[in-house]
Each structure stands twice: as structure tokens, then as C-alpha cells.
Curated annotation (Swiss-Prot):
This is Probable extracellular metalloproteinase 1. Transmembrane segments: none annotated. The keyword Zinc applies. It comes from Arthroderma benhamiae (strain ATCC MYA-4681 / CBS 112371). Zn(2+) binds at H430, H434. The active site is at E431. Glycans are attached at N287, N475, N594, N623. One of its GO terms (biological process) is proteolysis. Its EC number is 3.4.24.-.
């Protein structure tokens, strides 16, 4: 689950319901009594990444060019992994930076190896820019399991997962319905928000072996789990992935992180017709007078349930979403109209800005109607204001493209009166960015690629980075420090270990700090600290656009702030599945190489090197090696 604060017992899943957290050691599943520590089930880092610089050392491959970007990518996989069985994943696209993103899934006996992926990035020149690889290279099973079918049935797998993870699901009397050759749905269960499913697949294990598993998918609200149950032993769980992110609007305007930074304004038609041509109040088939449209649907959810369609949402006369609010109002339900409106506004602006930076239909964004622009539709973001399923947190669930994302914004009880997460834009941007990073890393069809401890940490760090970049003010300099979640948590220190700062005395975090950290939000603070250094290096070089949208020149933002946001986003789509810091750094460098021909190479290197991720830094999950060195041309 991806959340702002570590909800009691939740902060450990291979992240996909993402929360918005402060340092915590609590890692149990959704805080239930008897819950297990999901860190035990995280996937291991297995990916390699061949950067653009490394590709140049392989001329026979780097210079390969033939036909479409799909053909180029397919040929690369064939050359790199000869005699391997694989399939093309149907989520390939050419991004707005001109890079063709193609992903392949390894198979064995026609069965997916669910954590074995190969992603190829083809540049505008038709040549391979870079690629990532986590294909399994160990011994293959001697026989096809579908011949003897000597594995447990899917119902046994569901019961095994329920027992092993202490899930609140009842399956007595349930039955199985076939969905495809290797996938079934369980009908007649209770305790889940949708019917659980199970898919037969392999999992490449950390010890180099291969396990046949049932991938059991259960959406229980605060957690949306993919649990890989051994297909021979119904008590053995190998890994767990969690997906758990003419009208007027009276709101805190974009750029204000929380109510302490300004006053509410009445904005008219605040959407951007280039990125939301249907406006925020239509999906092209229906026009709405409530907080519902193509990109999002926002409502009051006091019981924390899943029946969002029938929940209350403001529907004002004449489309005037203008409601009273002040932080002193109490109880929170008295200002629910303002809360839902604010949540709807901030999330829609996120959609529009991220669209401009490259998170569009082809890349797997969140929209009901994709208007023939690619990708899968029917997946707006479900926005639950004052969600009753928890307090002192927020989270975002990111299933694959074509299924709605889900954000839950909670009431925070750290102040009197309580504070509503909907009014802290930094929290909402952080959560929405979980949807961005999970759809880009691994491709729109695979939301399982930020599940290792370091990649999960980067998922949290990206959320903080975009929230911090958006809140920069005109007079800010590299000496400006920002805390995360200060208002909602009623704490001047916020919810992170340190403020985001370029001053090593204020924030001393470096790459090797991760050697002592085992929690994703803490690791994410290290990653965002590095990105904050890169951000200011680029601002110092290119200046800062304080407007709400980037200005592009030949496809490149003409200022340092939006340029940093752009290349970081492009890097997400380039990097391999479950990347580590070193690989993600290289992907950002490759993104800049593609976008600007490497014009900002030294600014990027210096930002990372200052925090120990320079030339020579090496990833080892137990003993990372730091480096402050930069390439010779940057000295």
C-alpha cells in the first residue's frame, strides 16, 4: 500500500497501494491483529540495466536497425537472450519524447514467469537507447506442468493465502469460474471488494530456482494484493505485491501545499483543454454536475466501503463548487463539500500537468474515455474524501491500465480540530504520483515493478519530489528547505526524517544511508533528497518557471524545474522492472541524453554524486558502496 504515513502495520508491502508516511517500524498487513510482516514477502532485486553509454560499447547491437521499433526491440531480445521463450506485452507505445517503450514477458511451457521481464527503449533514430532485463536464466522445469497437472487447485491456493496472510476473506461455499486457460475467478466469497482471481504462473526465486505458483489477487480495500502461493505447497507464499496513488471551484490554488501557504480562491474552468478536452465534468458520453468526469470521481466515503458510485458528492446549481471551509471548522463532515471539491481539483490538475509531461493515454494514464489516443480506458481515479477506513494517512491503489486507480484521503487527528488530508495538496500529489510511477515503471500493463525494498522506496521518493517541485515559490533558492506533511501532521518536522535541503548540515542523507534503512518511506527520503539536488542544479542552469504549466521549446521544457520533472518522469519509463538507485540514476541520464542530447549530464551527475551516487557507486542490498566522483568531463 502506498501511503503518506505508515498506517499501523502497513508499510512494508511491495508497494502498490501507496501511503504517505513518516518513519515507522510497523510493517504488518493493514494493522490487523495477528497480521504478518509483509517485508518477508518482498521480491528481490533481479534486474540489470544497460545504459546508453554501455550500449555504445556494443556496436553490433547498438547499431542494429531494421523496420519498426517493435521489430528492433524484438530482435534485440532474440540476440541478447537466444533460445529464450517470451511474449510481447501489449502495452508498447512511443512516448512524447520520441522513445519507443517495448516490454516482453518470459514464458516457460507457455506459462508466464511473472517477475521475468525485458524492457527495450528505442530512440528517435530507430536504434536501441537502453534496455533492462530480469529474465530467468536458471534450469528449466523438465516437463510441462499442464500435462500431469500435479499442482494444487486454485481454491486450495485461495484458502492458503487467506490463512497465511490472515486475510478477512471467507470462501466457504465459493466456486471457481474459468476466465482463460491459466486464470480463474472465485465466485461466492465475502470480505473482498471484488471477486478474487487466481492465475497459474512461475516465479523466479532469489536462490536462482523457479517456482510454479498461483497468483491470487485479492482487493480488501486498504490492501490490493497479488500473493504468489506455491502450486505444490498450499502453505508456502513466495512473494506478495500490493497495488495499494463553465464551472467555478473554490479551492487552494495549485502551488499551495497546504492552508498555511495562502487563501482559497474561486477559479473558473480551471481545466486545460489541451490535456482534458472533455473538461473535468464530462467523459464524452455524459456531462456531470457533480465531482465526476473523465479523469476522476470524488465522493464522501465515511464508512470506508467500496460502493463509491452511490456515495454522496456535491452537485451544486449552476456548477458553482463554492463551499465554506476553514481549518478551525469541526467536525470534518460539516465541510465535506469543500473537501470533496478540493480533492477533485488537485487530482485533476495532477492529471493535466502529468499529461503535458508525458503521462498520456499511451503511457497508461487514468481516464474513462481515451478518445482513440491509445491505452486502455475505463480507469479514472476513484477519490474518497474523509475515508472512514483509517486515520492519519492517505493511500493510492494502482492496478494495471484499464482498471480504476483508488485514492483514500483520511482525517488526521494530530491536531485539534482534526485536519483533512484533502486540503494538503502535497499529500494528494504524493499519492497521485504513485499512480504515475507504477504505470510507467514496468509499463501500463504491469503494476508490479516497484516492489523490491529500494524500488519501493523510490516510489515514495518520487511522490515527495513532485509534491515539493510543485510547491516551489518565486523567491525560493537552493537554500530553501521544505518539510513533508507538516500541516496535516501538526508538526514542524513533518513526516520525514529530515527536511528536503541541499545543505548537508540540515539533511545529511547519502546513498549509503540506505544500508541502515529497511522501510520504504525512509529510503524514499534519501531518493527525493538526491532529486532535490538535481532539481536545483537544473534550476541554477536554466532558471525556474513559476507558472502552473511548462513551456516547451522543441519538446523540451525551457526551465530547470519542469525539465527536472520531465526527465525524472521519462526515466521511470526507461528503467527496468524493480530498479535500484544506480539503475534509476542511469535511466535519468539516458532520458536527458534522449531529450537534450546530454546537455545536462554534468548537472545531473553532480547532484547525485553530492549524495554518494556518483561514478563507482554500487548496489548491494546489504552493503551499498557510495561514491562522490563524477565523470572526468564534469570535473
Amino acid at each position: 500500500m502506498h501511503g503518506l504515513l505508515l498506517a499501523a502495520g502497513l508499510l512494508s508491502l511491495p508497494l502498490h497501494v501507496l501511503a504517505h508516511p513518516q518513519p515507522s517500524t510497523s510493517t504488518s498487513l493493514a494493522g490487523r491483529a495477528g497480521a504478518v510482516d509483509l517485508n518477508e514477502f518482498r521480491v528481490a532485486h533481479r534486474s540489470s540495466y544497460t545504459s546508453h553509454d554501455e550500449m555504445k560499447k556494443l556496436p553490433s547491437i547498438a547499431s542494429f536497425r531494421q523496420g519498426t521499433y517493435l521489430e528492433v526491440a524484438t530482435e534485440l531480445v532474440k540476440q541478447t537472450m537466444p533460445n529464450m521463450e517470451f511474449r510481447l506485452v501489449d502495452d508498447h507505445y512511443v512516448g512524447d519524447s520520441g522513445i519507443g517503450h517495448v516490454r516482453f514477458r518470459q514464458t516457460m511451457h507457455g506459462i508466464d514467469i511473472d517477475n521475468s521481464d525485458f524492457n527495450v527503449n528505442v530512440g528517435k533514430d530507430g536504434k536501441v537507447l537502453s534496455h533492462g532485463n530480469s529474465f530467468y536464466t536458471g534450469p528449466a522445469p523438465s516437463s510441462n506442468p499442464m500435462v500431469k497437472r500435479d499442482f494444487i487447485d486454485p481454491m486450495q491456493a485461495l484458502h492458503g493465502v487467506r490463512k497465511a496472510l490472515n486475510l478477512p476473506i471467507k470462501a466457504d461455499g465459493a466456486h471457481v469460474e474459468d476466465m482463460s486457460e491459466h486464470k480463474v475467478m472465485f465466485k461466492g466469497t465475502s470480505g473482498a471488494l471484488s471477486d478474487p482471481t487466481a492465475k497459474l504462473c512461475y516465479m523466479a526465486k532469489e536462490d536462482g530456482s523457479l517456482a510454479l505458483t498461483w497468483r491470487v489477487e485479492t482487493d480488501i480495500g486498504d490492501n490490493w494484493l497479488l500473493s504468489y502461493m506455491d502450486a505444490k505447497e498450499s502453505s508456502k507464499v513466495h512473494n506478495v505485491v500490493d497495488y495499494v496513488a463553465h464551472a467555478t471551484f473554490q479551492v487552494y490554488k495549485w502551488g499551495l501545499a497546504d492552508p498555511t501557504e495562502g487563501k482559497r480562491e474561486i477559479l473558473t474552468n480551471p481545466w486545460n483543454l489541451k490535456t482534458s478536452p472533455l473538461t473535468w465534468l464530462s467523459d464524452g458520453q455524459n456531462n456531470y454536475t457533480a465531482t465526476r468526469g473523465n479523469n476522476a470521481i470524488a465522493q464522501y466515503n465515511p464508512d470506508g466501503g467500496s460502493d463509491y458510485e452511490n456515495n454522496y458528492r456535491p452537485s451544486p446549481k449552476n456548477l458553482k463548487f463554492e463551499y465554506p471551509y476553514s481549518p478551525d471548522m469541526n467536525p470534518p463532515k460539516t465541510y465535506i463539500d469543500a473537501s470533496v471539491t478540493e480533492l477533485f481539483y488537485t487530482s485533476n490538475v495532477c492529471h493535466d500537468l502529468y499529461y503535458m509531461l508525458g503521462f498520456n493515454e499511451k503511457a497508461g494514464n487514468f481516464q474513462v474515455n481515451n478518445r482513440g489516443q491509445g491505452g486502455k480506458g475505463n480507469d479514472f481515479v476513484i477519490l474518497n474524501a474523509q475515508d472512514g477506513s483509517g486515520t492519519n494517512n492517505a493511500n493510492f491503489a494502482t492496478p494495471p491500465d484499464g482498471q480504476p486507480g483508488r485514492m483514500r484521503a483520511y482525517i488526521w487527528t494530530r491536531a485539534n480540530p482534526p485536519r483533512d488530508a484533502s486540503f494538503e495538496a502535497g499529500t494528494i500529489i504524493h499519492e497521485y504520483t504513485h499512480g504515475l510511477s507504477n504505470r510507467l515503471c514496468g509499463g501500463p500493463a504491469n503494476s508490479r515493478c516497484l516492489n523490491a525494498i529500494e524500488s519501493g522506496g523510490m516510489g515514495e521518493g518520487w511522490g515527495d519530489f513532485y509534491a515539493t517541485a510543485v510547491r516551489l515559490k518565486p523567491n525560493d533558492t537552493r537554500k530553501t528547505n521544505y518539510v513533508k506533511g507538516g500541516w496535516v501532521n501538526n508538526s514542524p518536522k513533518g513526516v520525514r526524517m529530515y527536511p528536503y535541503s541541499t545543505d548537508m548540515n540540515v539533511n545529511p542523507l547519502v546513498y549509503t544511508s540506505n544500508n541502515k534503512l529497511n522501510e520504504v518511506h525512509a529510503i524514499g527520503t534519501v531518493w527525493c533528497t538526491m532529486l532535490y539536488e538535481v532539481l536545483w542544479n537544473l534550476i541554477d542552469k536554466h532558471g525556474k518557471n513559476d507558472g502552473p504549466v511548462p513551456i516547451f521549446e522543441n519538446g523540451v521544457p525551457n526551465d530547470g524545474k519542469y525539465l527536472a520533472m520531465k526527465i525524472v518522469m521519462d526515466g521511470m519509463a526507461i528503467q527496468p522492472c524493480n530498479p535500484n538507485f544506480v539503475q534509476a540514476r542511469d535511466a535519468i541520464l539516458d532520458a536527458d541524453m534522449n531529450l537534450t542530447k546530454g546537455a545536462n549530464k554534468c548537472e545531473i551527475w553532480k547532484g547525485f554524486a553530492k549524495r554518494g551516487l556518483g561514478v563507482g557507486a554500487k548496489f548491494d542490498p546489504k552493503n551499498r558502496t557510495g561514491s562522490t566522483q563524477v565523470p572526468n568531463e564534469c570535473k
